[in-house]
């Protein structure tokens, strides 16, 4: 995606994912967003069986996820910049995170008080903003 088009594309994407029937999907996903704090142990951890199906491909994460979606639960792990959760998308900067935000409802799902307080603000007051082990869990991200 060309840098000059990113800002316009991101703004269009946010409009697309926050209105109409897609807006309902985004609000449902956003209502389930969780900020997971340090030392968190999931109550669902017991009985988990890892089948070692971990892939680290050199490709767009959403394209890879689409290829694997039929084989069970699929997750995309992506490191967020706590200073700008859109990855610069809304400012027109090109980055992997910006493209992911432009192609999905990820940014509207993260653009909430819960994420700003539990992830962005918390990270801001660390010695270095990347010292946090917190993560943002967004179930059912919709991608186009």
What is each PLM-predicted segment?
Residues 1-144:
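Macrodomain-like recognition of ADP-ribose-binding/processing modules
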């Amino acid at each position: 995606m060309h840098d000059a088009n990113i800002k316009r594309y991101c703004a269009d994407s946010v409009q697309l994912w926050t209105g109409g029937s897609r807006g309902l999907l985004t609000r449902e996903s956003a209502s389930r967003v969780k900020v997971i704090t340090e030392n968190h142990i999931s109550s669902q951890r017991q009985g988990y069986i890892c089948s070692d199906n971990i892939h680290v491909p050199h490709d767009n994460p959403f394209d890879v996820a689409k290829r694997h979606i039929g084989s069970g639960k699929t997750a995309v792990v992506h490191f967020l910049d706590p200073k700008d959760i859109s990855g610069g998308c809304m400012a027109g900067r090109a980055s992997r995170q910006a493209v992911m935000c432009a192609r999905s409802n990820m940014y509207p799902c993260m653009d909430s008080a819960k994420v700003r307080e539990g992830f962005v603000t918390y990270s801001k007051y660390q010695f270095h903003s990347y010292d946090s082990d917190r993560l943002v869990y967004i179930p059912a991200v919709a991608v186009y």
